[in-house]
Amino acid sequence: MEGEIYQSLILGYPNIISYETTKTIIDQMEQNICKINIGNYQGTGFFCEIPFPDKNNMLPVFITNNHIINEKILYDENPEIEIEIKFDGIKKLNLKDRYKYTNKEYDITIIEIKITDEITNFLQLDDNIINNIINNENKNEVYINKTLYIIQYPGGNLSVSYGTLENIIKEEKGTFFHKCSTKGGSSGSPILNLNNKIIGIHRQGLNNNSNKGTFLNFPIKEFIELNYPDYNLRQYNKKYGKYLDSLSCEKINIIYGKLGDEGFKHLCELKFTNLKEMTIPNIGITSIKPLEQMKLDKLEVLGLCDNIIPDITPLSKVNMKELKLLDLSSMNISDISVFEKVNFEKLEKLNFGYNNISDISVLEKVNFKELKELDFHNNFISDIKVLENVHFEKLEILNFNMNKITDINILDNVQFKFLRQLLLNNNNISDVKKFNKVKFRKLEKLELKNNNLSYEQIKYIFANLKSKFFK
């Protein structure tokens, strides 16, 4: 039956070889190719591995045309596509939280494949294409007049077509003409050489029996640059690093990029001598040990929030004597005892929000002479008695929102003469008998919402406190 279906497809397409000849190729490749269903429209896509960012780190991806999966589909609020793989049937891929890239000029879309997708068969790029990507070269002339083939889903059925690469269109970056016969549904098919390695993707059939394709090295390089924040640093250091004595950069700001531990290690190996700010939230790192090798004696701002780094002990081995702002929020931290060993005498703002901290006894052992803002919101702190022995003479904002505090009477022994804001919302506070003795003469804002306090207790507090005003 398959042979009959196949023969009915090839009428009028002389470069499509016989069913018997192609069956071996189809049997080998059918798990690497898939049919894409977008409404009533069908196309082809394929699975392959690409350097990310080099040969030592290959990333499995899914590739098709931009005119099949475009920006609207890719970045939809709930992006999902339906693909059909022979023997595996129909799979639905949710495209959220993946590396992805699409480009109308190249007519290509590249999407990361994850382990949970349960796709295990991947085509390989031709070595010349990989070298072009890694070395930023364009040596694609070697494919001119070479025999190629496409494995595709014309009319929704798997087939193979042979042809040659005619020429490269210099006016359209990465574009070439090929003679492999195609039909409706072939869009997004891989173009391979006789070594079964991919060189490009089929884009469009033309009226003159020629077809357009795109070399994969150009879009894959852009995919890496977009999704691997460390890529440009790697390329720069690879080319010039051995000649550099120092980098005078003052600011590093990588927002929500997936740098990862390997990329972070490489970043820390660069020779920064004048770095004043490093903000790297949610970049996928799990250790800050690489900071130990950096020269950070001029650093004033360090933001590490939204990375899962429970162990912050390496901070004790980093010289950051000029540090003024340290953001350690949302990092799964429970132990902050390392602060007994750090020397942050100029620190003004310290944020521990959204962690698992319950013990803050180390605060009586630290020397933060310039600290103005201390944030412990959303932790598991129940005992704040240590504040009696803390001397943060310049503290202006103290945030204990969303903790487990029950007793705040100890605050009558606390000397924060410049405190302007005291935030205690969403705790379990019930005892405020001694709170009328608190002497926060600069206090402007006191918040006690969502505690176990009666109206009379709250009235008692505000009636006895002599501050400027409360908001």
Each model region followed by its residue ranges:
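Catalytic nucleophile loop of clan PA
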Residues: F46, E166, S181-R203
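Conserved hydrophobic beta-strand positions in leucine-rich repeat
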Residues: E250-I254, L275-P281, L299-L304, L323-L328, ...
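A structural signal for leucine-rich repeat
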Residues: F264-K271, I288-L296, I312-M320, I336-F344, ...
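Protease-domain processing segments flanking chymotrypsin-fold serine proteases, especially trypsin-like
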Residues: M1-N56
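LRR N-terminal entry segment and analogous cap-like coil->beta motifs
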Residues: N232-S287, L296, E300-C305
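Serine endopeptidase catalytic core focused on the charge-relay Asp
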Residues: D27-Q42, N56-L59, I63-T175, N193-N195, ...
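C-terminal cap/linker of serine protease catalytic domains
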Residues: R203-N232
